[in-house]
Amino acid sequence: MRLQVALAFALLSLNAHADSRATAFVSAYSDDDNLTVVSPEVALRQELSPAVDVEASWEADIISAASVDVMTAASPRGFEETRHGLTAGVTWKPEPEVTFGLKYLPTWENDYSSHGLSLRTGYEWLERRLEQRLDLRASFDRVGRAGEPESEWRDLELVAVGPSVSWVIDRWTVASVAYELQAQSGFQASPYRFVPIDWSSGTTVSAPERHPEWRVRHALALGVRHALSRRWFASGGYRFYRDSWKLSSHTADAGLQYATRQERAIVGVDVRGYYQGEASFYQERYTAAPGTLPSYRSRDKMLSENWSVLAGLRGEVGLGPVAFTDDVRVAARTEIYDQHFLSFEPLGGRRAFIFQLGATAEY
């Protein structure tokens, strides 16, 4: 199935002074739970006219795993797989203050396929100090087991709506608030995981993982960015999440950044803390009467109570014009990520190291 790894990093948002740009970067994630993910990506954005831009990108996740999830499921030797993803999009600005964007996002691997669509609208008010956006997303996925006929794969559908507002409070401060409502319907368990059930008779049986087929998610995020001086910038944010599986989480983050004159070089440090409770049907150990099974059962550690911390350093350097380009910028980031599971018997925690290196050429 598709392995959704929360790689807690992103390439620096490089300043865009040109209308077209090409980007390439590679990310590497490795933890002490024997999971390694290498993720290359290339992207191109091209201006067709003053009002229309097009973009295209390719990305991949090259995964090698022998983690606890794998070793306790039906793949005792671990696995290696590659996920591919494409993006094709167009942005239209009929007026300087108005933006419409449309993207198509297909992804595929040997046991998962997805076709996604996203639509974004944006409008700037009050001399462009207030920006409101509305994001609409939908995806149509198919989930199966490697080697299984696709006719036996199961469906998973998603729709989401996300309004957001950002406000330039003064020349030093920008604040934002965003909300997302998401609904998923279909197969949401792992076709590989099996859950041990302790019968009261003393026998332990193993049953396929089974999750509810309906899930509604809510997320509210607040953020602020403040210029402490012409060189120093601070940022902070908070996100609250709650869903119909009674799982809730809290995320807080903060960052500090220094920029040289004309932002030719930028360095920064970021920290993030996360805590979540467990889903209503999740149990570390399940018990049942002989011959019966719990209606819903899970061996997914990401549905258990857990907390994590992340800290990272990042840097960005502008090289100026190179060959036919107007500017080339190189960015790097390194992070350490600690996660601790409070109610997952096979694994108490894991530590990961994350590195990313990339470049953007503007032309």
What are these regions (language model features)?
Residues Q46-L48, W92, Y123-W125, W167, ...:
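Residue-level signature of outer-membrane beta-barrel architecture
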Residues S20-A24, V54-A56, F100-L102, L130-L134, ...:
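Transmembrane beta-strands of outer-membrane beta-barrel proteins
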Residues H17-E55, Y337, G349:
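Short glycine/proline- and aromatic-enriched beta-strand/turn motifs that initiate or cap beta-hairpins
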Residues V26-D32, A60-S64, P106-N110, W125-E127, ...:
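Transmembrane beta-strands of outer-membrane beta-barrel pores
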Residues A24, V42, L86-A88, L119, ...:
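Membrane-embedded beta-strands of outer-membrane beta-barrel proteins
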Residues T121, W172, L313-G315, R351-Y363:
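Outer-membrane beta-barrel "beta-signal"
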Residues S67-G78, Q182, Q188-G223, R242-D253, ...:
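Outer membrane beta-barrel transmembrane domains
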Residues A16-D19, A51, P96-E97, L126-L130, ...:
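Short loop/turn motifs that connect adjacent beta-strands in outer-membrane beta-barrel proteins
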